[in-house]
Amino acid sequence: TWYWEPYACDNGPGTPVGNFVVSEAQFNTMFPSRNAFYSYSALTSALSSFPGFATTGSDAVRKQEAAAFLANVHHETGGGVHIVEQNTANYPTYCDYGQPFGCPAGQAAYYGRGPIQLSWNYNYKAAGDALGVDLLRNPWLVQNDSVIAWKTALWYWTTQQGPGSMTAHSAMVNQAGFGHTIRAINGWVECDGKNPAQVQSRVTKYQQFTQLLGTSPGGNLYC
């Protein structure tokens, strides 16, 4: 969605698109080595499907949410470099045959893909249902269509709490703290002392990104 702003007639690289609080120049600073798949234009296209993301609350809260999302994306993708999960040995483990819909794309088809590394057959089913795309039968769309890839990450961020007690979106807009976003995304593996180095990686990137956007990181950064 584009918004006409009379005081911002120029959509140059320093101007946020629409009402997104991160400009393309800032995005490129965050992801200097990114794969072209993770484009700013694909992200801003995906945002139209999630109108509450980084638009809720004060300017500081909006920037904190954008920074938190992009910091987690940076961690999950190695700085926007990796589109698919690098450990191929894990690929067959993401099929939960206990689900009534099974794994129609194959047992090894539901590996991590995209900005937040969507994995498991049930997550592909739920994301696809929400986005109106059959990701259960065609999970490869998440590694081939960059807008769909960004949408799956935003879907997870705004609707899924994982092992946590709230979604990452709720954690940021209600100022519960960045640590809750880590728990929602990968709490089983990283939180409660399981992998402090991974947690620190996410926190450090979040602190860098909030500084870049000119806001404070807030409290409760760890999980």
List the model feature ranges, each with a label:
Residues 205-218, 222-223:
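Substrate-binding and catalytic surfaces of secreted/luminal carbohydrate-active proteins
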Residues 44-48:
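Alpha-helical tetratricopeptide repeat
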Residues 11-16:
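Extracellular fibronectin type III
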Residues 52-65, 81-86, 164-176, 217-221:
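Surface-exposed patches in mature extracellular/periplasmic domains of secreted proteins
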Residues 17-42, 55-56, 64-156, 177, ...:
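Peptidoglycan-targeting cell-wall enzymes and recognition modules
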Residues 136, 141-210:
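Extracellular low-complexity, Gly/Ser/Thr-rich intrinsically disordered linkers
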